[in-house]
A protein has these predicted regions:
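Compositionally biased, intrinsically disordered low-complexity regions used as flexible
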Residues: 171, 342-348
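Periodic, rod-like helical contexts
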Residues: 350-354
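Flexible phosphate-sensing "switch/lid" loops adjacent to ATP/NTP-binding sites
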Residues: 1-295, 304-321, 327
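Cysteine-nucleophile active-site neighborhood
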Residues: 1, 317-328, 332-335, 339, ...
Length: 358
């Protein structure tokens, strides 16, 4: 995108739920709602924050939605009485969903993330759809990037490449071979490790990318640029008409993020505070707002069920501000999140109103 290309990202989730709207936040994190009202995966929030774009229902597809669409078509008679099968009907619907964004003409590059793990039975139709799609699109029109983990054994002091070798082998057995392998790692990759992965996974050594742990997720694009991931991707896609990337604004954001001049403490009242992903967009908003104002935002998690009229002063002591997040559905709150949660949230709000009015 920094090179002037129009980019969007979509997420394919292998679970059978039609959308994440009814998933327990403890299991799946927050449900991210797009501008068109679609209830989607929380990753779409990351896509919007990183690219500065707006996503829609087309950016998030689940197995449940795929099957629902295919069954509806079968009930209408669209398949003319044919036996409906995973291949070709389910895989065709997956391919249609992948191609929809590209056919809009609004983008130069579509990044499609397939959730789950290679070898999961739920992921097999997606891998097969990718195999077919690569063949149909032709050479230079698509590429496959495989994200893998390199475990580090502290006792032995070495990185293990076997899991990566086996996952690539499993992908290849299903007809899909990665063009690029991105290795998540705690330790830097030596040339020997990269060469070993390249040899056993049948990719060029410059297509083995180190993705080391970063201080902030917003540092990752700069780390990927250092590994020349962008240049390799452009070559694989036969894209040659691009200017040099300008990441000045991005680097300025990171500089402010890492060098705050002040600190504020904000309380977050919620029901699912044990899992950070349950309130991911709120926490990321604090990061963005803090960096913009050169301020570090320290968030204090407060479980709404444990706030009472007797202890509210103690629970909210020393806070500069408060965000309250009780429920996520347009249902009677007491039924959805529990009356204790509602009462605790209201106690917190009343306390803040009184404090501000003094």
């Amino acid at each position: 995108q920094a090179r002037g290309l129009r980019v969007t990202i979509q997420k394919l989730d292998p679970y059978i739920n039609v959308d994440p709207g009814t998933l327990n936040p403890y299991e799946h994190g927050e449900c991210y709602v797009t501008d068109d009202g679609a209830e989607t995966d929380l990753d779409l929030g990351h896509y919007e924050r990183f690219l500065g774009i707006r996503t829609t229902q087309a950016n998030n597809v689940t197995t449940g939605r795929i099957y629902s669409t295919v069954i509806d078509k079968e009930r209408r008679g669209d398949y003319l009485g044919k036996t409906v099968q995973v291949i070709p009907h389910i895989t065709d619907e997956i391919k249609t969903r992948i191609l929809t964004l590209g056919q809009s003409g609004a983008y130069d590059v579509i990044i499609t993330e397939i959730g789950g793990t290679v070898g999961d039975i739920e992921s097999l139709p997606y891998v097969e759809a990718i195999r077919q799609l690569r063949l149909e699109l032709g050479e230079g029109q698509s590429m496959v990037l495989h994200l893998t983990l390199l475990p580090y054994l502290k006792a032995a002091g070495e990185l293990k490449t076997k899991p990566t070798q086996h996952s690539v082998k499993m992908m290849s057995e299903n007809g899909v071979h990665p063009d690029i392998i991105v290795c998540r790692t705690e330790q830097p990759l030596s040339k020997e490790i990269k060469a070993k992965i390249a040899l056993f996974c049948n990719v060029k050594i410059d297509a083995v990318i180190e993705a080391a742990d970063a201080k902030s997720i917003y540092e990752v694009p700069l780390l990927m640029q250092q590994e020349q991931l962008d240049i390799i991707c452009l070559k694989k896609l036969n894209i040659t008409w691009y200017p040099e990337p300008d990441l000045t604004i991005w680097k300025g954001f990171l500089d402010k993020l890492y060098n705050p001049t002040s600190t504020v403490t904000i309380g977050l009242i919620g029901k699912y505070i044990e899992l950070q992903d349950a309130y991911k967009s709120i926490l990321e908003a604090f990061i963005h707002a803090g960096a913009t104002n050169e301020c570090k935002v320290e968030v204090v998690d407060i479980h709404s069920e444990f706030i009472t009229a007797d202890n509210v002063d103690e629970k909210l002591q020393g806070l500069d501000g408060l965000v309250e997040r009780m429920g996520q559905k347009a249902l009677p709150l007491g039924r959805y999140v529990g009356q204790k949660t509602v009462d605790g949230g209201l106690n917190g709000i009343r306390h803040q109103v009184k404090t501000r009015n003094k």
